[in-house]
């Protein structure tokens, strides 16, 4: 067994989920490649005194089900899986699909039905009522997305996933404190001039508890406060389709105009429901090892010098009241290589070209987190 896999399993069980004796842990694995990690997790959960429950999923079969699925199917499927989820104390989700585009040709109406009638409530139950963590597993598909060899990608992956998240967590405290005092945020960059309020919405740090890799601090904008335009410079894969050159224009919180490489298709996403045209999350990425996009949200949203501004559902622990079947983390990178940019808290410049420029936040610059 690769010792890096053993270390990752230990981090997931002991740090991310903090599994205690007697606790029930669901391991949900997608694809063939994560099996070595699943095996290590089972051993680690037993060592912690917990009870592992393993569920293996195949994206090809999921696509086949969704292509034909109806409300009757999803109602019972949701009922069964909600029952199982409600018995769990913790959840570890691992994605290792061989083809990230497996769902690309599923009609949008069928995907919407699947998400609304099955996936949405199940996700809410997992997020709000279990100790959970989700991650990808390094395979050839991910290496292709990152334009590297598998060996090189594995080295990058384990550096990112096994870094000292305890150190990162302490460093994030200063940013949490800053954001808690902030009322107005303005972000400026190439094709971007965006402003919004945070108000009294809570600020949450993410340092390896729920996502691996991790490295973000998030809150949410006051729902109707967002105005201006944002040009995202990071490709975004949604239901198997890669969107690029996404530009959103906001008026009083609502997306009133959306364009992309497929403008019709992206507007279908934002027409999923009323909440899909409002933003449920604003987050700042700080992972020092992730420097460029690889078309994988779990990595891209943590890019050092980035932020993401997320149409759709807000998280309960930092809620602005927005509800939706979607939660789509769209990323904008502000490092010099991607055009630079500035971030202001209550009129004060706090980050320029991806680097924090105020003394209390410099601890989050990459050289201080490695």
Mark where each language-model region is:
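Long, well-ordered mid-to-C-terminal structural blocks that present hydrophobic/aromatic surfaces
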Residues: 224-268
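Dual-mode signal for accessory low-complexity, basic/Gly-rich regions
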Residues: 257-323
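A short, compositionally biased
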Residues: 178-184, 242-244, 335-342
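Short, glycine-/Ser/Thr-/acidic-enriched flexible segments
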Residues: 32, 97-99, 139, 201, ...
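Internal helix-turn-beta structural module
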Residues: 295-369
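Short aromatic-centered micro-motifs
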Residues: 187, 249, 343
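Active-site lining segments that contact anionic ligands and/or coordinate catalytic metals
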Residues: 227, 243-245, 252, 277-281, ...
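Active-site bordering "gate/hinge" segments
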Residues: 1-228, 359, 364-369
């Amino acid at each position: 067994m690769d010792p890096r896999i053993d270390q990752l399993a230990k981090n997931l069980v002991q740090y991310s989920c903090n599994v205690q004796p007697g606790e029930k842990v669901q391991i949900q694995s997608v694809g063939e490649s994560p099996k070595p990690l699943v095996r290590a997790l089972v051993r680690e959960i037993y060592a912690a005194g917990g009870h592992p429950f393993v569920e293996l999923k195949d994206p090809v079969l999921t696509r086949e089900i969704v292509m034909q699925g109806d409300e009757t199917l999803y109602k019972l499927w949701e009922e069964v899986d909600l029952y199982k989820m409600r018995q769990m104390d913790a959840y570890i989700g691992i994605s290792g699909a061989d083809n990230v585009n497996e769902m690309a040709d599923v009609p949008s109406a069928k995907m919407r039905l699947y998400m609304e009638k099955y996936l949405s409530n199940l996700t809410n139950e997992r997020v709000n009522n279990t100790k959970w963590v989700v991650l990808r597993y390094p395979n050839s598909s991910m290496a292709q997305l990152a334009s590297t060899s598998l060996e090189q990608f594995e080295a990058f992956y384990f550096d990112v996933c096994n870094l000292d998240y305890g150190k990162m967590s302490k460093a994030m405290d200063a940013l949490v404190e800053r954001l808690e005092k902030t009322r107005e945020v303005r972000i400026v960059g190439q094709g971007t001039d965006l402003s919004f309020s945070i108000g009294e919405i809570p600020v949450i740090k993410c340092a390896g508890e729920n996502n691996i890799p991790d490295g973000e601090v998030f809150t949410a904008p006051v729902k109707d406060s967002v105005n201006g335009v944002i040009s995202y410079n990071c490709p975004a894969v949604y239901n198997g389709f890669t969107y690029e050159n996404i530009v959103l224009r906001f008026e009083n919180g609502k997306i009133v105009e959306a364009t992309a490489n497929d403008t019709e298709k992206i507007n279908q996403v934002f027409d999923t429901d009323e909440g899909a045209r409002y933003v449920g999350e604003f987050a700042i990425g700080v992972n020092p090892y992730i420097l460029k996009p690889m078309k994988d949200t779990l990595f891209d949203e943590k890019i050092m010098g980035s932020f993401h501004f997320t149409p759709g559902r807000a998280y309960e622990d930092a809620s602005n009241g927005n509800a939706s079947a979607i939660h789509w983390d769209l990323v904008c990178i502000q490092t010099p290589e991607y055009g630079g940019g500035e971030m202001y808290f209550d009129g004060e410049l706090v980050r320029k070209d991806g680097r924090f420029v105020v003394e209390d936040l410099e601890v989050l610059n990459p050289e201080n987190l490695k």
